[in-house]
Amino acid sequence: MRKGYGDEYRTKQMLVEQYGKDNVIKVAIGSFGADFLILNKGKLVKVVEVKGTRKKVWYPLPREKEQLRRIFHFSQIHECEAEVWIWTKNRGKKELRIESVEKFIGGDA
């Protein structure tokens, strides 16, 4: 199993529960960078990127910041939300933190 798959699987289950199976699309395009697109009544409403770490806090690497910039730009074009779902470990348990992509790219967009 590849790194991060468990976090993506957990995230997909939560998104399907919230938005319905037909409205959650797994994206497999490397150059774009996001993991999931969320639709509602034929309109794109959210772009979700999933990140995982074995530490308590996740800090994006320069390559990941560039990926987040692309996601943010895409979300601006399509007028939708862009979120990072961050799975961290706390005392052996996985915890989820949901943040706006904009928080991590600051004024760099």
Language-model features, listed with the residues they occupy:
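Short acidic/glycine-enriched loop/turn segments that link adjacent beta-strands
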Residues: 30-33, 92
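Short, charged, amphipathic alpha-helix that recurs within catalytic cores of restriction-modification
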Residues: 53-81
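Domain-level recognition of nuclease-like catalytic cores that cleave nucleotide substrates
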Residues: 72, 77-109
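A structural micro-motif
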Residues: 22-23, 45, 80
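Structural signal for conserved beta-strand scaffold positions within catalytic alpha/beta enzyme cores
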Residues: 26, 49, 84-86
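Conserved catalytic cores of phosphodiester-cleaving nucleases, focusing on short active-site segments
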Residues: 15, 36-38, 43-54
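Acidic-basic catalytic patches of nuclease active cores, encompassing PD-(D/E)XK
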Residues: 1-27
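Short secondary-structure boundary/capping segments within folded domains
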Residues: 26-30, 37-41, 76
